[in-house]
Amino acid sequence: MKLVLKISGKFFDEENIENFISLRNTIKNIVNEGHRLAIVSGGGSTARKYIKIGRELGVNEAHLDLLGIWASRLNAYLLTFILSDLSYMKVPENLEEFIEKWESEKVVITGGFQPGQSTATVAALVSEAIAADYLILATNVDGVYDKDPRYNKDAKLLSKLNTETLKKILETSQSVKAGTYELLDPLAIKIIERSKIKVIVMNYKRLNKILDIIHGKDIGSIIEPM
């Protein structure tokens, strides 16, 4: 099975060593079972910090995007070094380079590719390029909710939904400014739909459950492409 794991930048913000150990052990188990894996990392608070400073000083959005991309690559290199016995040691900087490195049979870890593109879009592009069986979005919530759980205590977790439902949920909460992407942006959804990529949203504190997903168990929210 081929998997793409998109790890939210919030994973890195927590600086929780146990989370990193769990991730490393999980990836080793996935590889030992004979599965292929690519990882895409978000930029997290490191990206937001530099983007905030740059924006206040008048830096344009394209250059702010570059700051976010470099922050996401820094996080990607951290994972690359943690998984040095399994991973390709150079973080790809574009899709062509990723495809080339994928042929190495190693775990390929990347961050952002280009301005105007979220790391969620990168994850969707990578999933499309390798014909992934699943794109797994590991974030700080248990799945997709019918409304933003940060601000609505009555928000309900949706175990299954399609991309049309997801678009309606995200309509009022998304921004296209650098450093503000959440979950999936419109371009990522478009790629998911055109290539019929199955997406799973789960909490990164449950990364040890990825093998359960591979073995057919429902974890988090499953998003079916329309």
Curated annotation (Swiss-Prot):
For this protein, the Enzyme Commission number is: 2.7.4.22
Q: According to its UniProt record, which reaction does this protein catalyse?
A: UMP + ATP = UDP + ADP
Q: Which residues form a coiled coil?
A: none
| Keywords, alphabetical | ATP-binding, Cytoplasm, Kinase, Nucleotide-binding, Pyrimidine biosynthesis, Transferase
InterPro entries per UniProt: AceGlu_kinase-like_sf, Asp/Glu/Uridylate_kinase, Uridylate_kinase, Uridylate_kinase_arch/spir
Write out the residues that bind ATP: 6-10, 44, 48, 139-140, 145, 148
GO-annotated biological processes: 'de novo' CTP biosynthetic process; UDP biosynthetic process
What NCBIfam families does the record tag this protein with? pyrH_arch (TIGR02076)
Q: How does it assemble?
A: Homohexamer.
Please give the name of this protein: Uridylate kinase
CDD domains reported in the protein's UniProt record: AAK_UMPK-PyrH-Pf
Family membership noted in the UniProt record: Belongs to the UMP kinase family.
Q: Where in the cell is it found?
A: Cytoplasm
Q: Which Pfam families match?
A: AA_kinase (PF00696)
GO MF terms here are: ATP binding; UMP kinase activity
The organism encoding this protein is Sulfurisphaera tokodaii (strain DSM 16993 / JCM 10545 / NBRC 100140 / 7)
Q: Give the principal location in a single coarse category.
A: cytoplasm
Residues the entry annotates as binding UMP: 43, 65, 113-119
**Main EC class the enzyme belongs to:** transferase
**Pathway assigned to this chain's UniProt record:** Pyrimidine metabolism; CTP biosynthesis via de novo pathway; UDP from UMP (UMPK route): step 1/1
